Amino acid sequence: MKQKHSRIGLISSVFIHIVLFASFISLVEVSHSDLSDGDSPLSIELVAALLEQPQVAVAPEEVTSTEPETFDEEPEPEPDAIPEPITKPIEKPKEKPKEKPKKPEKPKEKLKKEKPKEKAKQIEALEKGPEAKQGIVAQAVPGALQGKKEQVGISNGNPNGNSASSSDTGLVNGVLGGNGNGASSNEINAYKAALQRALQHRANNAYPAREKMMRKTGVVTLGFTISPSGKLIDVTVLNSSGNQNLDAAAVQAAEATKVAPPPIGFPPNVTVPIKFSIQ
């Protein structure tokens, strides 16, 4: 606003000066012309009056530099830099190490030292009084000979008959009636059946733990000789079961078995099958 008023004042003062200057010049010219014609006192007075007018002192305008107003523009906020997505390298899944198949642990074979169990009790013949004359020999194998067989054994007895007096006779005591002419076929068959049961019982107790756990079965046919004392010697495998451990267990069971002395006429060489089965 101040600049606008100053401009108006400047223009008006210039205009007034121009008017005054023009009027002054015109008066001077008129006065010169009048003087030339004869100066009149009126023109002189007018000129003097004009000259006597006080000149209006016009103050020089202050030149104000009109600098354009500068508005401090707020800097536009820079857009937030969008962070570039960090691409992680795709990790390949680590291959799991292949587990080695575990070998089946071999169970430790515990050697069970078992005392020979007697399935049947041996009754020693007492050589006293009239019983000694009859040569009564008790039958230690249950069910081996019953009924008439026992009567035959008693009737065949004599003072010279063999009696099972040893405690090492084991699981077999045939009806060893004191018959000097030899044992009957029934006695031999009963002795052989009792021998086979004794071997089977011993083999069941000697069943290898590993084969039992793996449910290995088989039949081993053994051949051996019975000594006069009832010990099994020269044990061999005539027919293998297909498993060496079962064969070895059968041989060990036979060698550890001791029975009563065989009856007279019993063949020394015997063949017995041993069956390993899981019940």
From Swiss-Prot:
Entry protein name: Protein TonB
GO cellular component: outer membrane-bounded periplasmic space; plasma membrane protein complex
Function: Interacts with outer membrane receptor proteins that carry out high-affinity binding and energy dependent uptake into the periplasmic space of specific substrates. It could act to transduce energy from the cytoplasmic membrane to specific energy-requiring processes in the outer membrane, resulting in the release into the periplasm of ligands bound by these outer membrane proteins. Required for heme utilization and virulence.
Periplasmic compartment segments: 28-279
Record's bilayer topology term: Single-pass membrane protein
Protein family membership: Belongs to the TonB family.
Biased composition (Acidic residues): 69-81
Membrane spanning stretches: 8-27
Cytoplasmic side: 1-7
TonB C-terminal domain: residues covered: 192-279
Composition bias type Basic and acidic residues, residue spans: 89-120
Keyword Metal-binding: no
InterPro entries on file: TonB, TonB-dependent_transducer, TonB/TolA_C, TonB_C, TonB_pro-rich
Renumbered residue ranges of the record's region Disordered: 57-120
Gene transcribed to yield this protein: tonB
Compartmental location: Cell inner membrane
Gene3D superfamilies: 3.30.1150.10
GO MF entries: energy transducer activity
UniProt KW keywords: Cell inner membrane, Cell membrane, Membrane, Protein transport, Repeat, Signal-anchor, Transmembrane, Transmembrane helix, Transport, Virulence
UniProt record, GO biological process: protein transport; siderophore transport; transmembrane transport
